[in-house]
């Protein structure tokens, strides 16, 4: 039945949901890549859709910005609508010089300055890692497409406008591939409620060089990332 944030019924969502931050990107993904699409959520403008990809039922829904927002939607999808796997498909900022604009990054894990996972984990550090099979399937899907992806750690920040830019030096030293705002939270929710999660990002801006993509490009492109996510679902079904 409907929750405070999702006005759908059991069965409206597939067992796998792709989740971009921007609900308009969710609409673009549904209209561009899925067939037989129907809208399944519009509460607070957080659009959700269900359709098929090569005959496989898949849903796509926005999750908003930041760990608190994405945690609400991920939790309700898992506990109230039977979702088993969440693939976040979003954007990230690069801090390393060898990571370039529009590179695709598959997050094996996510560091964070948020305390949300510590609240879940009795004030201890929780290693927010992606599901191994989902990660491997995404890497294999990228190889099949001929897309060179980066695989490693992300950093999920609580603040978009950080007061401590020196932290970027620390991230670079530790090999962080991209800075975003949700991966660690989605992994934590998935672990708490018995689901699986993965984050795939496209580099939308470079924190060091100042290069950036446009808002329109972020909303309506990044197709390699989406196709990798969708194809990885099919590989998971055939495993």
Swiss-Prot record:
<comment type="function">
    <text>Catalyzes the reversible phosphorolytic breakdown of the N-glycosidic bond in the beta-(deoxy)ribonucleoside molecules, with the formation of the corresponding free purine bases and pentose-1-phosphate.</text>
</comment>
<protein>
    <recommendedName>
        <fullName>Purine nucleoside phosphorylase DeoD-type</fullName>
        <ecNumber>2.4.2.1</ecNumber>
    </recommendedName>
</protein>
<feature type="binding site">
    <location>
        <position position="5"/>
    </location>
    <ligand>
        <name>a purine D-ribonucleoside</name>
    </ligand>
</feature>
<feature type="site" description="Important for catalytic activity">
    <location>
        <position position="218"/>
    </location>
</feature>
<feature type="binding site" description="in other chain">
    <location>
        <position position="25"/>
    </location>
    <ligand>
        <name>phosphate</name>
    </ligand>
</feature>
<feature type="binding site" description="in other chain">
    <location>
        <begin position="180"/>
        <end position="182"/>
    </location>
    <ligand>
        <name>a purine D-ribonucleoside</name>
    </ligand>
</feature>
<dbReference type="Pfam" id="PF01048">
    <property type="entry name" value="PNP_UDP_1"/>
</dbReference>
<dbReference type="GO" id="GO:0004731">
    <property type="term" value="F:purine-nucleoside phosphorylase activity"/>
</dbReference>
<comment type="subunit">
    <text>Homohexamer; trimer of homodimers.</text>
</comment>
<dbReference type="InterPro" id="IPR035994">
    <property type="entry name" value="Nucleoside_phosphorylase_sf"/>
</dbReference>
<dbReference type="InterPro" id="IPR018016">
    <property type="entry name" value="Nucleoside_phosphorylase_CS"/>
</dbReference>
<dbReference type="InterPro" id="IPR000845">
    <property type="entry name" value="Nucleoside_phosphorylase_d"/>
</dbReference>
<dbReference type="InterPro" id="IPR004402">
    <property type="entry name" value="DeoD-type"/>
</dbReference>
<feature type="binding site" description="in other chain">
    <location>
        <position position="21"/>
    </location>
    <ligand>
        <name>phosphate</name>
    </ligand>
</feature>
<feature type="binding site">
    <location>
        <position position="44"/>
    </location>
    <ligand>
        <name>phosphate</name>
    </ligand>
</feature>
<keyword id="KW-0328">Glycosyltransferase</keyword>
<dbReference type="GO" id="GO:0005829">
    <property type="term" value="C:cytosol"/>
</dbReference>
<feature type="binding site" description="in other chain">
    <location>
        <begin position="204"/>
        <end position="205"/>
    </location>
    <ligand>
        <name>a purine D-ribonucleoside</name>
    </ligand>
</feature>
<dbReference type="GO" id="GO:0006152">
    <property type="term" value="P:purine nucleoside catabolic process"/>
</dbReference>
<feature type="binding site" description="in other chain">
    <location>
        <begin position="88"/>
        <end position="91"/>
    </location>
    <ligand>
        <name>phosphate</name>
    </ligand>
</feature>
<comment type="similarity">
    <text>Belongs to the PNP/UDP phosphorylase family.</text>
</comment>
<feature type="active site" description="Proton donor">
    <location>
        <position position="205"/>
    </location>
</feature>
<keyword id="KW-0808">Transferase</keyword>
């Amino acid at each position: 039945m409907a929750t405070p944030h999702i006005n759908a019924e059991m069965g409206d969502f597939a067992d796998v949901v792709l989740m971009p931050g921007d609900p308009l990107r969710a609409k673009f993904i549904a209209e561009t890549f899925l067939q037989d699409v129907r809208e399944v959520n519009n509460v607070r403008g957080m659009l959700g859709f269900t359709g098929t990809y090569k005959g496989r039922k898949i849903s796509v829904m926005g999750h908003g910005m930041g760990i608190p927002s994405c945690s609400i939607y991920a939790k309700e999808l898992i506990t109230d609508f039977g979702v088993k796997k969440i693939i976040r498909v979003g954007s990230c900022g690069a801090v390393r010089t060898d990571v370039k604009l529009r590179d695709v990054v598959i997050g094996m894990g996510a560091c964070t300055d948020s305390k949300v996972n510590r609240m879940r984990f009795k004030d201890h550090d929780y290693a927010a890692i992606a599901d191994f099979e989902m990660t491997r399937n995404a890497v294999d899907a990228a190889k099949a497409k001929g897309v060179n992806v980066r695989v490693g750690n992300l950093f999920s920040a609580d603040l978009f406008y950080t007061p401590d830019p020196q932290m970027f030096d620390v991230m670079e030293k530790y090999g962080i591939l991209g800075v975003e705002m949700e991966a660690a939270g989605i992994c934590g929710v998935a672990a708490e409620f018995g689901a699986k999660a993965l984050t795939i990002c496209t580099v939308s801006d470079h924190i060091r060089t100042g290069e950036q993509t446009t808002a329109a490009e972020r909303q309506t492109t990044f197709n390699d990332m989406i196709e990798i996510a969708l194809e990885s679902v099919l590989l998971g079904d055939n495993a």
